[in-house]
Amino acid sequence: MKQLEKLIIEATVLTEPEAEVERVMQVCNACRYCEGFCAVFPAMTQRLEFGKADIHYLANLCHNCGACLHACQYAPPHEFAINVPKAMAQARLETYQQYAQPAAFGALYRRAGITVALALIVGLTLFLLLAMALKGSLIHPPLAGDFYQIFPHSLLAWMFGSVFVLAIGLLMAGVIRFWREISPGVPRSAEIAEASHNALTLKYLDGGHGKGCNEADDAFTLLRRRFHHFTFYGFMLCFAATVVATGYHYVAGWEAPYPFFSLPVMLGTLGGIGLLIGPAGLLWLNLRRSPLHGDARQKPMDRGFILLLFLTSLTGLALLAGRDTSGMGILLALHLGVVMALFLTLPYGKFAHGFFRCAALLKWAVEKRRGKHAGDTGN
């Protein structure tokens, strides 16, 4: 009786996207044709009903590869209209909104295009005006690449350090709450290792057969996986460049500017190239993708994030090329403005999907070893 009451309560509080995932999963659980495609379907088979936590877990476990859509006999125009990628994408947006910190800022996910545009305007205006205030002009005699003659190191470290730490802290607070609600128990080292491998290799963007995802049609391609790798590892190389440069400054006492063949500059250059190739490729695929894949309402969020990553790299490489010229001030202001816009939107844009997906992958690694109820206090 208590189980029935629980199901009734859950049914009454499901949002429309959550209810659609529940409907789709009930049909898929009866069919199971797609069981070998990715982690979603084996995880689905461990359940007879789908509560809110299950729905959000499965939605974030889905990588939107599209294989199940093109293999499904019940996909549109069938009257069942089973479209797993679309249902999961719509539920993921609910995840981001419901677990946003502070909660009121969850609405920014639905207005991500406007949010990115405003953040970009604020960031660019801030640093262009700041450069004018500190130097009196955006054009100056060549400064031999010394950025700190325009913006003091302490000012940049304080501004960007505080914004980045706050953004990651807010994002992690939501992910931790998500993790606790899907109740997977405490992960072991082998489970963490497997989830990390699956995340870093993007295992579930191979379509379940190694040939890749579906994009514009039912043809398989590994391009989305490749462009994601360029983007992620390009970002991580740029982050590594910042970490190394910070170590040079605070530990070794070596102040910028660093020569081109120094470790920070080489890491940043390679990362920047990756952040040009990856986002450009992802945007190209996004523009070509079948309208049946994913949620069309999220395209502004997807494209806004892609654009910010691309502009971060483009302005950074332009700054490197022009750092010994009289235009370094304006190039630096443009680059810092774009980076600030990226940092400001990290907790309320597409960046969040990587964190929630990693949590779902870790849950799956725990679940397939120990069962669905591993760590659940009520079971």
Swiss-Prot record:
Keyword Kinase annotated: no
Transmembrane segments: none
Binding site for [4Fe-4S] cluster 2: 38, 62, 65, 68
Gene Ontology MF: a single term: 4 iron, 4 sulfur cluster binding
Residues that coordinate or bind [4Fe-4S] cluster 1: 28, 31, 34, 72
Keyword Ubl conjugation: no
GO biological process, one term: citrate metabolic process
Gene giving rise to this polypeptide: citB
Record-given protein name: Citrate utilization protein B
Taxonomic superkingdom: Bacteria
Keywords assigned by UniProt, alphabetized: 4Fe-4S, Citrate utilization, Iron, Iron-sulfur, Metal-binding
